[in-house]
Amino acid sequence: MEKEKTCKIVFSDIDGTLLTSDGQITEGTKEMILNLENKGIPFILTSARSPEGVRVIKRMLGNHAPIIAFCGGLILDNDGNEIYSKMIPLKRALELKAMLDKDFPAVACNTFGGEKW
C-alpha cells in the first residue's frame, strides 16, 4: 500500500495568483485557506510587495502565518519579527547603482531598508 502524501505547508504569491484581476479574494479561495489552517497547514503569503502590502492581504484572510516580502529578501513571523533578511551591503548597492546609471540610464532602481521601499 502506498503511503499517503500529506502537504505540510503552502506558499502562494499574491498578485496574479491569489487575487482576482480586480484585486479580490474569492470565497472559495478563502474557504480553502481556512481548511488548510484548520488542518494545521500554514498558508504563507509571498510577494515582491513590501511587508505592509502583504499584511493588507493577510488581514483580508485573517491569516496567522509568517510572510515573505520583497521577493524573499525579508521574512517576518506573525508578530512582525524578522526571521530572515538578505540585504546587499550599501557599498555594493551604490556600485551597482552607478553602473546602472552609466550603462542603462532608462532603468529605474528601487531600494528598501527594513519595511520601507
Question: What residues fall within each predicted segment?
Answer:
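Acidic-enriched, low-complexity/disordered segments with a strong bias for Aspartate over Glutamate
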Residues: 2, 13-15, 22, 77-79, ...
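Mg2+-dependent phosphoryl-transfer enzymes with acidic/Ser/Thr/Gly-rich catalytic loops
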Residues: 2-9, 25-27, 32
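Asp-based phosphoryl-transfer active-site loop
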Residues: 6-23, 96
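Active-site phosphate-binding/coordination module
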Residues: 27-117
